[in-house]
Regions:
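Walker B catalytic acidic pair
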Residues: 87
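Active-site-proximal or metal-binding-adjacent scaffold patches in catalytic folds
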Residues: 1-82, 91-126
């Protein structure tokens, strides 16, 4: 289930990137709540996911989205879509959840809700 939902998350990001061309090429990985050196240089803690948007120069984690394995075990398609919309907004708008970030997140999430209505989002599960 983890690998299936991880692939779904990657496909949702590709769908989002097809509409929002300024999104960077991104790597999406899963890891446990503890520090996992080969996957990420930080801990994910209780958050479902986090983004490495301002990684150190030449860091291998730049533009990486890390998702908690526990979340991937039970997340629905729309929960994954909402999380990807959230983290993708962090890759474009640096910093905290300010007004600019909120607007960008809403644009991402509205696009994905529209994709759900027309059946495009379900194809991300294949």
């Amino acid at each position: 289930m983890i690998e299936y939902n991880l692939t779904t998350a990657r496909n949702i990001y590709k769908l989002l990137k097809s509409e929002f061309r300024d999104l960077p090429k991104s790597k999406i990985v899963a890891h446990t709540t503890k520090k996992h050196e080969k996957v990420c240089d930080g801990t994910i803690g209780s958050a479902y996911a986090h983004a490495h948007s301002e990684a150190r120069k030449n860091s291998r984690y730049k533009n990486q989205i890390c998702i908690q394995q526990k979340f991937l075990c039970s997340a629905s398609l729309m929960e994954i879509a909402e999380m990807i919309a959230h983290e993708a907004a962090h890759l474009v708008i640096r910093g905290i959840h300010g007004k600019r970030w909120e607007k960008r997140y809403e644009r991402h999430y509205d696009f994905l809700k529209e994709c759900k209505k027309n059946g495009e989002l379900e194809r991300c599960e294949e």
